[in-house]
Amino acid sequence: MKSEQLKQFERYAEAVGAERYRVTSIKMQADGRKQTFILDKKDGITRGFTPQEIEQRTPEMQRLQRRGENLYYTPLSDKKHHILIDDMNREKLERLIKDGYQPAAVLESSPGNYQAIITVSKLGTAHDKDVGNRLSDALNREYGDPKLSGAIHPHRAPGYENRKPKHQREDGSYPEVRLLKAERRECVKALALSSQIDAEYQRQAALKAQQPERTKAKPALELAAASGSAIDAYQRHYRDVLKRQRGGEVDLSRVDSMIAVRMRVTGHDQAAIEGAIRQCAPATRQKDEGRDWNDYAQRTARYAYSAAQPQAADLGKYRQQWEKLEGREPVRQQEQAKAQKIERDNSPGMSL
């Protein structure tokens, strides 16, 4: 008779539709360290298991759980992205679905905490890897864990226990990872977003191909410069956003994303936003995060001009308010002042 873990895997795999599944076991040490073991890894290479091989390996996975280890799946496919949206509460999960995204699988990884896997076909272009990474980054910034990066990412295995020490119950047991939804489908909205991201890469590649040879000889990474006004705008928005946060730990990556969208609304271009984040964001952290700030600034500014485009349009009603925050006259007031000046200049002068 099939075990409950195998039944849950079969429902999950039928929905996600991956070609192979990497299985990772993580042992949580008493001192907080993690010991990681990838079941199929051999000579430094891991390709994952077919669904049939998972069935054969299930008894081994059950033994690992009895030893106190945590089990994870990573879906792998040559022609599909399987995007994990991690660390969602119920509100974020409902918003994801309300906004039109269609997860193939939804997991309750711990009580009140959810993970979703969205399947979307790769476009078959030279930019597939970058598109997948950008798609994961955009969706997690908006709905999940903004620190999560990369399109290929492990998630909790349904049917097995979440053995994080903080989840241990009074009787010594642990909550089981629950498969709440499993439906074989690909997400149309995520495909549209990936097409938009790919088109941006295609445009960049076309522009680069048109550059003269002397320009191509420059270093590949040209950092955007931040004007004084952009830096000042970042700092003003940073103080304003923090002032509006209520209790708990502030997610500074999400704060930077909010600032980037605000600055787009008030008319700063992508390069100026990127430069301001690169220059200002490291100073807002109390400790060194070991982050590549150039890449971080590029991704955050890009987010404001791609995935957050609908959000920026909705927030246009706050433009004048945010322009005042930046210490600038709203555009409408500038236009009125300009019109009044022209009217004065064209009016007949008074003679004494």
Swiss-Prot record:
Listed GO biological process terms: DNA replication
Key words, A-Z: DNA replication, DNA-directed RNA polymerase, Nucleotidyltransferase, Plasmid, Transcription, Transferase
GO cellular component: DNA-directed RNA polymerase complex
Organism from which the protein derives: Acidithiobacillus ferrooxidans (Thiobacillus ferrooxidans)
Protein's name according to its UniProt entry: DNA primase
Listed EC numbers: 2.7.7.-
Ion transport as UniProt keyword: no
Disulfide topology: none
Basic and acidic residues compositional bias, start-end: 318-332
